[in-house]
């Protein structure tokens, strides 16, 4: 039978929600009955010794696994008669489960069968029911079913708040699921009943260490981000003061083009700016990276080295041999990102392509009123005259 069939067609998430709501409702009923009992006592009447609401919890309605095919404990099983009390029957099932559990992982399913049988008796000894649940949780802990461990132990400690094994197993399962705060809370609850419990103290220490490690990593990340922002603000200020260069936020991850994620615009001791520049060839999804495009360098200076006119060297992707100096055009898009310095006023215009002449130096382009450096300068390289070129300029790509 599938999981959905066994749970009435519910998904795992829906089943978890149903379970959580049922436990909450049951706890509320317990509190209401406790209050009612106190009122009975105050009136000199006899309080209700126990309730049966817990018997309707989904945890007691799970489908049993198949009965063991070869049962070496059959004699003990057959000794159960109608004369036995529910508590005696449940204890016999539990003992059979314990025997199978001790035989190891190959018999875990058999052990589960008998722990489920013990629970299905629904005896009125809540201390015993607490043990059956925590025993079943022990098997699921070994099987890695941590969610089931938490469910069983949550009810187990409600049945018997002094069941230290249930606290321990629940805290370990929460630790395995990286629910460190929940694990600490579970340990604290158990330790409130038994302050000297070493197992719970150890689990709590481990959970707290994990939690502190996470907090430290998060704080380190925040500190690093703040430091980076301060560095960007300082660089943006210096660039703008230098020549109205407007440093902006990146428009996409540049590390795929620069091969170094920390590549950025720099200013040397002579106050000269060095631009790492990316040339994008949108027709083919290719790129070139220029590590140091100095302020007085023209675009032609670099393009002629990449596409020498006297001895053309065509890129492997340029099968039609269309990317030559006489056809290559360079473009940037206006206002494609926002400047880091919030006090810089940018003229709001519709985005458009601006062509850059080969003879223009990069300083003039970068200082253009509508050019904002997207972390590092980017320029688009296209070949004039073909179909892609027309679509590119029309923004129909």
Curated annotation (Swiss-Prot):
Q: Which SUPFAM superfamilies match?
A: TPR-like (SSF48452)
UniProt repeat feature TPR, residue ranges:
90-125, 130-163, 164-197
**Single annotated GO MF:** Hsp70 protein binding
Highest taxon, organism lineage: Eukaryota
Sorted alphabetically, the keyword list is:
Repeat, TPR repeat
One Pfam family per UniProt: Wheel
- Any GO BP annotation: protein folding
One GO cellular component this record assigns the protein to is: nucleus
Family the entry assigns = Belongs to the TTC4 family.
Tell me the protein's name: Tetratricopeptide repeat protein 4 homolog
Origin species, per record, is: Dictyostelium discoideum (Social amoeba)
Q: Which gene encodes it?
A: ttc4
